């Protein structure tokens, strides 16, 4: 609050908060408290003497005026609790963090934000938005102008057709209008008499005036005659006449040359007019809609008083504009009387500057024109190539933004409704308090004015005196500084020769520096040339290397092609081998069968004819053979010899089988390794299993089982805490188990096909091989039995059984499993035979 000395108030800020319930309650409480505390006791002494009472009243009024002049001191606690950010009602109003004191700062921030919004909106400056607006409006504007220009010929044709029809029917119009001739004559007579009566005095008054200005009119006529004579002199003389003739000649040539142009233009005009006439129907709908809407609008504005109000507003605006025109014209004339010389100087100076800038501006314009023209030429194909992408982008963005706006519309509507309702409620609650607030501010203003008004003149006088005293120092300061500056200028001038010498020294140094710079540039050029040479050599070497690589690739491709051709030939020959083997084995089988039959038949015939002689001879032969064999070989038991012979035969057959199956086993191991790598890489191993037999699958299963056991041992060696490692190994074990299942299925399938399928049994090669193998077996059995029978060995004894089993052992091998088991038995027998010896 102000005191007798006065307090300068820098700013009174008002901050309006939407929540006014607490504000109103606190304001009412504080006002009631102030009313209770502000109490004054006025002592009144009553006297019956009227004169004394009047004097006391005057004295009291003088005291009140004196106290009012001193000011009213009201103790108000405005201490602000900075920790709790609360300082009471007045503290909140006049200085609190959330009081009226922050309204100025908030208003300044709001103004800054509004200015920033004006400068930048959505990340784009005003210039950028102007550019966006131009780009957005350019295409529609060009389209509208082009459409109007395209429709203009048809509209002109329509109006021209209407005018031509009216001209052609003018006689009919005149004939139709002739019925109005009597009425028009009556009207003309009435109007003419009115003009005659009214204008007769006027023209009578003009008579003396015309008589007075007759000499002046004659002077004007003389001037016109002189002007016509001057023009005639120019056009009738030889140069003027030649120019007129040339103009007429060139005009004729121009009109002659316009013939094709007009023909083409007329054809284009007619074509465009025809197309526009076909589209007149499409123009009727919008025109009809416009006229209907315009009629409805006119009916509305003329019936509800809007038009009358608009005319009144227009009248007021027009009056203000015309009044402003008068005032501006008067002030402008006054300003022109004062600004004639300065404006003339400005125009002359600006003209001189512009004329001097014309060469530079011309160069800049040429530069900009060339650069922008070249830029446009180069950008045109780029824009053409990007046009589909721009169209797709515009369509996509349009769809996306339209959908987003449609989705955000209801939400923003609800938010706007909430904000509008809140602000409306807050302003409605604040509105009743504004008169009291304005009254309070008015009281503060009145007190400030009352308190400061007596002191303003004295303060102004004091400030004027201070300014005058300061201004009186100016001559002294100038008179002191000017001599110092005058003395300083020669000292500064003494430095100029030194600076000139320095510049001259630098200029003298330039001839020395320039050769050095040229040498450096030459060295740099040589270095660049060397680099270019090295680069060229490297490029050449790379080109040669590329050519070598291409030749190598070409040779490799030729080798692969030749290898492929050779492989095809080998495959073709291999495909022919089964047939050749089949035919050979078939013939061999037939020959063997026939020979066996002939041999057996001969034996049967011979034995049948000489049974007794054969028996005796066989006994002698057997005895002699046995003795000879025993003597030659040094053996006592032929059965033992034949037993070992059968064993050695089986062992040799096993070795042969092992040597024959060794490549197959190695191949199975290789395929198992490939299968393991395929499982590690996660590829499908089905292609590897194609074309494999049961034995190879069994070997693969054994390899996989060994790998599974190894991984299981490795998994058991990993600590249980390492779940990731154990899980990884378990995944590998699961993959191996799944692969074993696939191999087992493949083995079972092959086994089932071999046992139950008819395909293998129907193969001629298999039949031939089986017949070939069964023929010597049968022959050996029959011959052996007959021989044993001849030498007296028959029945189920040890020798006959051993020989029979040996023959069956040698020739009855049906599968690889049997061969492997035979190999194991032979190794065991060899060990036993060695121990027995």
UniProtKB/Swiss-Prot annotation:
InterPro entries: ARM-like, ARM-type_fold. It comes from the Viruses. Coiled coil: none annotated. SUPFAM superfamilies: ARM repeat (SSF48371). This is Minor tail protein Gp26. It comes from Mycobacterium phage L5.
């Amino acid at each position: 609050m102000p005191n007798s000395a006065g307090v300068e108030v820098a700013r009174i800020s008002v901050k309006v908060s939407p929540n006014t319930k607490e504000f109103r309650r606190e304001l009412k409480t504080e006002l009631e408290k102030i009313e209770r505390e502000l109490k004054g006791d006025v002592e009144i002494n009553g006297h019956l003497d009227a004169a004394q009472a009047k004097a006391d009243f005057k004295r009291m009024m003088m005291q009140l005026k004196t106290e009012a002049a001193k000011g009213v001191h009201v103790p108000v606690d405005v201490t602000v609790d900075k920790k709790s950010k609360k300082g009471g009602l007045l503290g909140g109003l006049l200085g609190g963090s959330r009081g009226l004191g922050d309204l100025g700062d908030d208003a300044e921030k709001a103004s800054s934000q509004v200015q920033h919004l004006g400068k930048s909106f959505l990340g784009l400056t005003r210039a950028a938005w102007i550019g966006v607006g131009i780009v957005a409006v350019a295409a529609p504007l060009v389209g509208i102008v082009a459409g109007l220009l395209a429709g203009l010929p048809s509209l002109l044709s329509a109006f021209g057709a209407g005018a031509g029809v009216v001209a052609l029917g003018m006689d009919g119009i005149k004939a139709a209008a002739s019925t109005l001739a009597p009425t028009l004559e009556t009207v003309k007579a009435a109007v003419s008499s009115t003009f005659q009566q009214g204008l007769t005095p006027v023209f009578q008054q003009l008579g003396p005036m015309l008589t007075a200005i007759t000499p002046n009119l004659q002077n004007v006529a003389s001037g016109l005659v002189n002007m016509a004579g001057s023009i005639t002199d120019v056009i009738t003389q030889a140069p003027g006449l030649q120019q007129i003739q040339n103009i007429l000649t060139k005009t004729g040539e121009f009109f002659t040359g316009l013939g094709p142009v007009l023909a083409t233009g007329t054809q284009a005009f007619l074509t465009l007019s025809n197309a526009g006439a076909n589209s007149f129907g499409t123009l009727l709908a919008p025109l009809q809609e416009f006229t209907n809407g315009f009629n409805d609008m006119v009916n509305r504005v003329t019936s509800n008083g809007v038009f009358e109000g608009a005319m009144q507003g227009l009248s007021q605006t027009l009056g203000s504009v015309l009044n402003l025109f008068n005032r501006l014209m008067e002030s402008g004339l006054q300003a022109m009387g004062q600004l004639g010389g300065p404006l003339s100087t400005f125009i002359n100076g600006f003209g001189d500057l512009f004329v001097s800038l014309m060469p530079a501006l011309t160069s800049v314009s040429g530069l900009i024109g060339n650069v922008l023209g070249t830029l446009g030429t180069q950008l045109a194909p780029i824009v053409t190539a990007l046009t589909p992408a721009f169209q797709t982008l515009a369509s996509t963005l349009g769809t996306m933004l339209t959908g987003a706006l449609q989705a955000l519309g209801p939400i923003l509507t609800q938010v706007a409704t909430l904000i509008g309702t809140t602000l409306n409620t807050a302003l409605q609650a604040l509105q009743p308090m504004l008169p009291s607030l304005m009254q309070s501010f008015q009281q503060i203003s009145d007190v400030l004015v009352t308190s400061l008004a007596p002191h303003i003149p004295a303060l102004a006088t004091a400030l004027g005196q201070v300014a005058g005293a300061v201004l009186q120092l100016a001559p002294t300061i100038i008179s002191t500084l000017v001599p110092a500056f005058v003395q300083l200028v020669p000292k500064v001038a003494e430095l100029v020769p030194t600076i000139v010498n320095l510049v001259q020294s630098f200029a003298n140094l330039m001839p020395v520096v320039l050769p050095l710079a040229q040498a450096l540039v030459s060295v740099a050029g040589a270095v660049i040339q060397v680099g270019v040479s090295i680069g060229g050599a490297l490029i050449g070497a790379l080109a040669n290397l590329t050519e070598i690589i291409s030749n190598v690739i070409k040779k490799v491709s030729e080798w692969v092609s030749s290898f492929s051709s050779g492989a095809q030939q080998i495959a073709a020959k291999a495909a022919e081998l089964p047939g050749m083997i089949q035919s050979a084995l078939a013939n061999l089988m037939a020959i063997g069968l026939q020979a066996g039959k002939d041999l057996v038949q001969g034996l049967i015939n011979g034995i049948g004819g000489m049974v007794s002689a054969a028996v005796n001879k066989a006994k002698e032969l057997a005895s002699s053979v046995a003795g000879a064999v025993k003597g030659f070989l040094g053996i006592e038991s032929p059965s033992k010899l034949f037993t070992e012979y059968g064993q050695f035969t089986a062992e040799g057959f096993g070795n042969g089988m092992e040597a024959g199956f060794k490549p197959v086993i190695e191949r199975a191991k290789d395929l198992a390794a490939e299968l393991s790598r395929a499982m590690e890489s996660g590829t499908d191993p089905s292609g590897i299993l194609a074309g494999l037999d049961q034995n190879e699958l069994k070997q693969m299963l054994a390899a996989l089982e060994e790998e599974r056991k190894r991984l299981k041992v490795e998994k058991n060696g990993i600590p249980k805490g390492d779940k990731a490692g154990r899980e990884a190994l378990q995944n590998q074990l699961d993959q191996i188990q799944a692969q074993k299942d696939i191999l087992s299925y493949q083995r079972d399938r092959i086994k089932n096909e071999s046992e139950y399928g008819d395909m293998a049994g129907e193969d001629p090669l298999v039949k031939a091989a089986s017949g070939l193998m069964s023929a010597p077996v049968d022959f050996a059995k029959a011959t052996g039995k007959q021989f044993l029978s001849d030498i007296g060995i028959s029945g189920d004894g040890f020798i006959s059984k051993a020989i029979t089993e040996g023959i069956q052992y040698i020739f009855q091998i049906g599968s690889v499993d049997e061969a492997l088991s035979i190999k194991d038995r032979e190794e065991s027998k060899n060990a036993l035979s060695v121990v027995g010896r």
